[in-house]
Structure formats: structure tokens, C-alpha cells
Regions:
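Acetyl-CoA-dependent GNAT
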Residues: 1-22, 27-29, 40-42, 46, ...
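Active-site acidic-Proline motif in GNAT/NAT acetyltransferases
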Residues: 27-29, 33, 61
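Short, intrinsically disordered/low-complexity patches at protein termini
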Residues: 31, 44, 88-91
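Short coil/turn segments at alpha/beta junctions that flank glycine-rich nucleotide-binding fingerprints
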Residues: 33, 49-53
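C-terminal "cap" of GNAT-fold acetyltransferases
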Residues: 53-56, 60-73, 79-98
Length: 98
């Protein structure tokens, strides 16, 4: 990682009453320091501030680290949402924001 290089990223796609967590990523060299959790908390706060009730996401079945983070953070598995279709390689999750 060079000086000034991005370490982590994430985004929200806002919808009517819900948002989709998009492109959350921490560079491998910075993992294990709590950045993923901090980024997720920041995105949840931003969603709440925008009046969002539900936060949803799609991730791959092989992304075990992300699945663990989301489950520990209160996300539960659901079926496809939005424009997604059933996909055996995808996991769909949501969390109610209070």
C-alpha cells in the first residue's frame, strides 16, 4: 500500500425504504484490524441518517470472511431482492436498522 492509497471502500445504493450495501472491500494488507466492521458501522449509520429501514446485500457463497462479518453484525439470510434472481453462488442478506 502506497501513501495515500485507498485502504477500504463501500457504498450504499438507496431505494425506497431500503438500501443495498455495495462493493465493501478492505485491501488484504489492512485486514484483521477491524476496518471492515468500522466501515460497515459507518455505512449503517449513513443509511439510518437517510431514513433507511432495511439494509440488504448480496455476496458470494465462498466469501466466508464477509459472511461471518455480516452474520455477527445481525444480518440474516433472505431470498433474492430487487433485480436479483436465484443464484446458487450468491447469498442474500438483510438487517433491520433501528
Amino acid at each position: 500500500m502506497g501513501a495515500g492509497a485507498p485502504t477500504a471502500t463501500g457504498a450504499l445504493a438507496l431505494n425506497d425504504g431500503w438500501a443495498e450495501l455495495k462493493r465493501m472491500w478492505v485491501v488484504p494488507q489492512a485486514r484483521g484490524r477491524g476496518l471492515s466492521k468500522a466501515l460497515l458501522v459507518a455505512l449503517e449509520t449513513r443509511a439510518r441518517d437517510a431514513g433507511i429501514t432495511w439494509l440488504r446485500l448480496e455476496t458470494g457463497i465462498a466469501n466466508h470472511e464477509a459472511l461471518g462479518l455480516y452474520e455477527r453484525s445481525g444480518f440474516v439470510r433472505i431470498g433474492p431482492f430487487g433485480d436479483y434472481r436465484p443464484d446458487p453462488l450468491s447469498v442474500f442478506m438483510e438487517k433491520r436498522l433501528s
